Amino acid sequence: MQRTPRMENLQARFDAVQDQLIDIYEKDTRSLEVQVTYWNLIRREQALFYYARQQGITRLGLYQVPLTSVSERKAKEAIKMSMYLTSLQKSPFAQLSWSLSETSPEMFFAPPESTFKKKGSHVTVVYDKDSNNAMEYAVWGEVFYVDETDTWHKAQSKVDYDGVYYTDAEGKKVYYVHFADDAAHYSVLGQWEVHFENNVLSPPVTSSFPGGPGRRQRPQTGSYSPGHKAPVTSRRRHSSSSDSHSSRRGSRPQSLSRSRSRSRSRSRSPSGSHARQRAPQDSGTNKSPGRQGGRRGDGGGGRGGGGGGVRVREDTFGGQPTQIAGRLGDRPAKAPEQTSRRLAQLIESANDPPVLLLQGCANTLKCFRRRTSHAHPHKFLCMSTSWTWSCKTTTHKSCHRMLVAFSDYEQRRCFLAGVKLPKGVTCVKGSLEAL
């Protein structure tokens, strides 16, 4: 396609937006004002993509122009984030540190939705008392939400047996995680335990999740309804209140899951009694003379036992081959005495982190770094900023450079095989003692 003045003008405006975005990425400023500027630039970028697609342009520089529906959705998302951040900028929380990840749409629309979040931790819920059947849920230490009057508030998340919630300015609990919802999918018995900050929260009676729209309400217990329940803090409190709850559930029919659990416990009791009957026979065999001699040998203090212990130690630890560490930056202390000096140097240099030195134009390298960081973040360890040699003794060193580091040589091989370098960018291989 022949380039027209209109296309060149569009390309120039797009490059200007990309330069400003790259500057924000490199500076990593945690100011709310910078975050607002960032989302305004994203909106402009998507608007240029939208216009270019309407004009039949499929590429702008190194970037593939997306469909108009994709550009429209991302532009609306950027407008929404810009409006929320502008409102937050007028609140007392504007002076806090805000990073790009904390103001991203993925974080903003995660539960609790339409809130900014900080200081995340996890709560573990074990279903059916099976440690392999457990789920982790996010608990945010700081939740920033806006009310109907465009006023921002900060709340702290809390955990009880029903789920994770925060208390709003009116004193109402706002749940954003309900454990009963996942219990309907992951639990067979309808039971779960909540492990949070070295505390275990469990119900005073065996709980099963009922069906229907009102499955979170348990009026028979009187302690776990979202409206008026008191948070449970330890097992000791459950045991002290079990008498009062047992009278309330007397008229309630027994659930199928509880009857199955009792049948399993009764079926295990015969095997347990059989094991107790066999115990005297086993203890009698321990008193035989041959067994007593073996026990003295195991202790290491008798005449027949000391040598056996030494032989086991020699077989276990003796003659192990020398292993060369394969982790990043690790080196063997010294090469074996049988190897030559050149071979020892090769062994030492084999563990140095491999790198690639890219050469090309500054803007091309910056765009390549941004594109690769989004599309192939797992294929390299880290990338440097673009730089040049300060003492230019020859004109051949005038191009910009950028280093790409890898954890091992296999990762570098996969990078060269799966990532295409831009036109005009060359690379050379190398390694460093450390990063």
Curated annotation (Swiss-Prot):
PTM statement from Swiss-Prot or TrEMBL: Phosphorylated.
Keywords: Activator, DNA replication, DNA-binding, Early protein, Host nucleus, Phosphoprotein, Repressor, Transcription, Transcription regulation
Region (DNA-binding domain): 352-435
GO cellular component, one term: host cell nucleus
Residue span of region Disordered: 203-339
Domain of life: Viruses
InterPro entries (alphabetical): E2/EBNA1_C_sf, Nucleotide-bd_a/b_plait_sf, Papillomavirus_E2_C, PPV_E2_N, Reg_prot_E2, Regulatory_protein_E2_N, Regulatory_protein_E2_N_1, Regulatory_protein_E2_N_2
Compositional bias ranges of the Gly residues kind: 299-310
Transactivation domain: annotated span: 1-208
Subcellular location: Host nucleus
GO molecular function: DNA binding; DNA-binding transcription factor activity; nucleotide binding
SUPFAM superfamilies to which the protein is assigned, alphabetical: E2 regulatory, transactivation domain, Viral DNA-binding domain
Compositional bias (Polar residues): 280-289
Chief place of localization: host cell
Record keyword Cell wall biogenesis/degradation present: no
Disulfide bonding pattern of the chain: none
Quaternary data: Binds DNA as homodimer. Interacts with protein E1; this interaction greatly increases E1 DNA-binding activity. Interacts with protein L1; this interaction enhances E2-dependent replication and transcription activation. Interacts with protein L2; this interaction inhibits E2 transcriptional activity but not DNA replication function E2. Interacts with protein E7; this interaction inhibits E7 oncogenic activity. Interacts with host TAF1; this interaction modulates E2-dependent transcriptional regulation. Interacts with host BRD4; this interaction mediates E2 transcriptional activation function.
Family stated for the protein in its record: Belongs to the papillomaviridae E2 protein family.
Name assigned to this protein: Regulatory protein E2
Taxonomy of the source species: Viruses, Monodnaviria, Shotokuvirae, Cossaviricota, Papovaviricetes
